[in-house]
Regions:
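Short N-terminal segments immediately surrounding and downstream of signal-peptide cleavage
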Residues: 26-35
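Structural signature of tandem-repeat unit edges
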Residues: 26-27, 42-60, 71-84, 93-107, ...
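Consensus positions within tandem repeat domains that build extended binding/scaffold surfaces
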Residues: 64-66, 86-89, 109-112, 132-135, ...
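Bacterial N-terminal signal peptides
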Residues: 8-17
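A structural signal for leucine-rich repeat
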Residues: 137, 157-161, 181-182, 385-389, ...
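Positively charged n-region of N-terminal signal peptides that target proteins for export
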Residues: 1-8
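Helix-loop-beta element that forms the nucleotide-linked donor phosphate-binding surface
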Residues: 181-189
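Sec/Tat signal peptide C-region and signal peptidase I cleavage site
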Residues: 20-24
Length: 462
């Protein structure tokens, strides 16, 4: 009977021309398990994104291309419940002129606010920690960008294809930090003081101890039931030091974007953070020694800053990871386990320390590496499959003081893998200028050797 009454009321409203109210659930597709809005089917020009769905479940993410490609959308208000803008969430909207972002936003994803032709101003809330590559790009009408907090991590191409007239206003007490970051990214942008101090957040603001499960006997975090996107793990719980992140403690978390691990932590366990596809940055402590099997598998990080205390990177610890910067393994690491950096989709340059003793089976296999540098005079034990299917690998440079025999041994190894790669002795830091030339080998005139020059760091290959 109730259903018939509703149908009758709807018919009357349609006949009289009265508007039929539309519930949020009717125009938004929501994944309650991952707290993400995935689709919008409404026709409003001014959209206020709901902060809850499905009878009270908080909206934490705007999904991939959620409000992209609209010709009619003119304004969007993102509620304070939202902490993540996924890829292209607010992009390619030709008439979108006003965006109000969440005051709790942590991560502005790749291409998230791009190619919006009518957008003239944008305010980045103080809570934002990460702005990924191309996040605010191709908005040629944009004249004013205001940052309210400390300088976040900013992708190298985060602010590109903007008007020459755009001015970036930053807190007065943070201007040098912002200038440094933009200069490091080779962006010559007009940065001016905003006239206000920064609204600052500390790591302690993101503690969520009550939602962590903890094994006091082993000092291990064993699980997390909270909804933080930025999360700080405490140094101790109820007086017991946190020494480890246990097996699958935070794996497949749908919201984690920025994690601070505590001083005193020594071990990250198997699958601890694996398949956490929103994770963009980890602050590692100076005490960490081991990252075990698949500890950060599928890490799609903004960058990877491993600590000098690290000694062992386990089997597939960073397999399937995607990081757009160079991979620098810190001095102190002794072993890279099997498949440790396999199938790393954006990995191109790798720098290995003199402390390294072993590179395991398939360590870098199926990764698009083009260049490897080995610092040590004593070369590590290298598996004959370490660089298997690295079809783009062209150069491996050894320390300048390595012997010719070491160079030939590594060359023989890559030859057995069928790679079109040359091994060189390199990195002569005492040479100020070296120019390209080709000369014959004295013992075999049919073969040539090359001396090379790189503007940023002079090198001689021999």
């Amino acid at each position: 009977m109730k259903g018939k009454m509703l149908l009758g009321l709807t018919a009357i409203l349609m006949l009289t021309g009265a508007a039929v109210p539309v519930k949020a659930d009717d125009v938004w597709k929501f994944d309650a398990q991952r707290f993400v809005l995935k689709e919008y089917t409404g026709t409003e020009t001014d959209v206020v994104v709901p902060d809850t769905m499905d009878e009270g479940v908080p909206v934490k993410r705007l999904g991939t291309q959620l409000l992209a490609g609209s010709e009619t959308l003119t304004s969007v208000v993102v509620p304070d419940s939202v902490t993540i803008l996924d890829v292209g969430a607010l992009s390619y909207d030709n008439n979108l002129s006003e965006i109000t972002l969440s005051s709790n936003l942590i991560n502005i994803g790749w291409n998230a606010i791009s190619s919006n032709d009518a957008l003239t101003e944008l305010t980045i809330p103080a809570s934002v920690c990460i702005i990924d590559s191309y996040a605010v790009s191709g908005c040629y009408a944009l004249k004013k960008i205001v940052f309210e907090g400390a300088c976040p991590l900013i992708g190298s191409e985060a602010f590109v294809m903007l008007s020459d007239d755009v001015v970036i206003y930053v807190p007065d007490d943070q201007i040098e930090e912002y200038k440094k970051v933009f200069e490091e990214n080779n962006k010559n942008l007009n940065i001016q003081p905003s006239g206000k101090p920064a609204v600052l957040y500390s790591a302690e603001d993101y503690l969520d101890t009550e939602n962590l499960t903890f094994d006091a006997e082993t000092g291990s975090i064993t699980g997390y039931n909270g909804m933080n996107t930025r999360l700080t793990i405490p140094e101790s719980i109820d007086g017991v030091p946190v020494k480890a992140i246990g097996k699958r403690a935070l794996w497949e978390d749908p919201l984690l974007g920025y994690v601070t691990l505590p001083e005193g932590l020594e071990y990250v366990g198997e699958d601890a953070f694996s398949i956490t596809d929103t994770l963009k940055y980890v602050e590692f402590p100076s005490t960490l020694k081991t990252i075990d099997k698949k500890g950060f598998s599928s890490y799609r990080g903004f960058r990877l800053d491993l600590p000098d205390s690290l000694e062992y990177i386990g089997e597939e610890a960073f397999s399937y990871f995607s990081v757009e910067t160079d991979l620098i393994i810190p001095e102190g690491v002794k072993e890279l386990g099997p498949g440790a950096f396999s199938a790393a989709s954006r990995l191109q340059r790798v720098f290995l320390p003199s402390s390294l003793e072993k590179i395991g089976d398939n360590c870098f296999s199926r990764s698009p590496i083009t260049y490897v540098y080995m610092e040590g005079l004593e070369l590590p034990e290298i598996s004959d499959t370490a660089f298997d299917k690295c079809e783009y690998l062209r150069d491996i440079d050894l320390n300048e003081k390595c012997t010719k025999q070491q160079m030939l041994d590594v060359q023989a190894l890559v030859d057995t893998m069928g790679l079109e790669c040359r091994v060189w002795r390199n990195q002569n830091t005492e040479v100020e200028h070296a120019y390209f030339s080709v000369e014959e080998l004295p013992d075999d005139p049919s073969k040539l050797y090359l001396t090379g020059y790189e503007e940023e760091a002079a090198k001689v290959r021999r």
